[in-house]
Amino acid sequence: MKQAVIVDCIRTPMGRSKAGVFRNVRAETLSAELMKGLLLRNPQLDPNTIEDVIWGCVQQTLEQGFNIARNASLLAGIPKTAGAVTVNRLCGSSMEAIHQAARAIMTGMGDTFIIGGVEHMGHVPMNHGVDFHPGLANNVAKASGMMGLTAEMLGKLHGITREQQDAFAVRSHQRAYAATIEGRFAKEIYGIEGHDATGALIKVLQDEVIRPETTMESLAVLRPVFDPVNGTVTAGTSSALSDGASAMLIMEESKARALGLPIRARIRSMAVAGCDAAIMGYGPVPATQKALARAGITVNDLDVIELNEAFAAQSLPCVKDLGLLDVVDEKINLNGGAIALGHPLGCSGARISTTLINLMEHKDATLGLATMCIGLGQGIATVFERV
């Protein structure tokens, strides 16, 4: 079987969804700039050899509608001979794009793919036009479509306290801020034009959503937002609303080597799994277990892990049941996570994978895992290996 490898991976800075730096920048532009960036950074690649552009996006309407993958690729000047498709596995959409490209390469159905994802949550809110079938209530809990309530449920089932959630959120902001000021995000962030608070055009080079002033004391005063009476999940322990895109150049290994392109990581294994929709945040556990089994390794073999922080109340049960509580500070989300950076839905899968690969390089690590939960009860996971 042929090997699928990551040649390059970049992301936009994460912009605040409410009056943020990308308030005047469309989702197609965020996407197209990254596509162009990959080609500029890898001039050995002939764009005419691109098989397909696979782009994750959840809210495929308004500016994100009518196959945003094709719209963005045309904006980017990618040859019209390349295909383009938009995929939707909710929060796991751009990781699904990674998997689709990898499967195509492994089975000989193409050797060069641009993949990624985008979500402009400021322009297209996450609940825009959502209309669940009434019959779903016969099969899943009625609150399963409300992500915050599923986090409350998962946290209660696993005995996660408010204080544990607050501490996890503080850690996310502190680590993301440290990564910013120490330049650890510099290699993965691709600068995009946006606008500052005065409306002036600027090149955005840093994430806008990190709150370095976050403390246990500042979080303690926040009220629960999803279950005001008995809940523990607050805005401060939930992933921030942000706008952003991420992208990767994925190729067949021998072709990349023949062109003299870097092999930043090999895709070792992939998996998806389902779980009860009422505790959708638990999905990373069964997905990770399947991916590890397919890779022939155990969780102890992993050097670095990126777990998407939809909610602290969701992340901590996954960490616990994967047997990772004792190594959180050595292995997990070392540059912070979505609580600090935000979770632009269609962007996040490739974003956490990009952050993971850069962390693996920084730490000279061999094996890494990127995994995330998915609304209505799914998980997705990818094991990467540096070679």
From Swiss-Prot:
This molecule's function is given as: Catalyzes the final step of fatty acid oxidation in which acetyl-CoA is released and the CoA ester of a fatty acid two carbons shorter is formed.
Family (UniProt): Belongs to the thiolase-like superfamily. Thiolase family.
Q: Which UniProt keywords apply?
A: Acyltransferase, Cytoplasm, Fatty acid metabolism, Lipid degradation, Lipid metabolism, Transferase
> Carries keyword Cytoplasm?
yes
Q: Does the keyword Cytoplasm apply?
A: yes
Q: Which GO terms describe its biological process?
A: fatty acid beta-oxidation; phenylacetate catabolic process
User: Where does this protein act, in terms of pathway?
Assistant: Lipid metabolism; fatty acid beta-oxidation
* Gene Ontology annotations for the cellular component aspect, listed alphabetically: cytoplasm
Please report the name of this protein according to its UniProt entry: 3-ketoacyl-CoA thiolase
Q: What is its EC number?
A: 2.3.1.16
The record's subcellular locations are: Cytoplasm
Q: Which domain of life is it from?
A: Bacteria
| A Pfam cross-reference name | Thiolase_N
Active-site residues annotated for this sequence? 91, 343, 373
Where does this chain mainly localize?
A: cytoplasm
